[in-house]
Structure formats: structure tokens, C-alpha cells
Curated annotation (Swiss-Prot):
The keyword Secreted applies. GO terms for biological process: proteolysis. Belongs to the peptidase S1 family. Snake venom subfamily. It comes from Crotalus durissus collilineatus. One of its GO terms (cellular component) is extracellular region. This is Thrombin-like enzyme collinein-2.
Amino acid sequence: TALPQLRLPATSRILCAGVLEGGIDTCNR
């Protein structure tokens, strides 16, 4: 999945994935 947040550090990506799994789409925010 190519997200505009790809520029964020790997840590942010992992946090994003964790949040996405929780059901909250914080990545798109």
C-alpha cells in the first residue's frame, strides 16, 4: 500500500500499522 506517509520514519509506519489494526485510520489523518 503506497501511502503519502511513506516519507515518515519506519517507526511512524509501524505505529501507523498498529493503529490501523486497532481499527483507527490515523495514517490518513
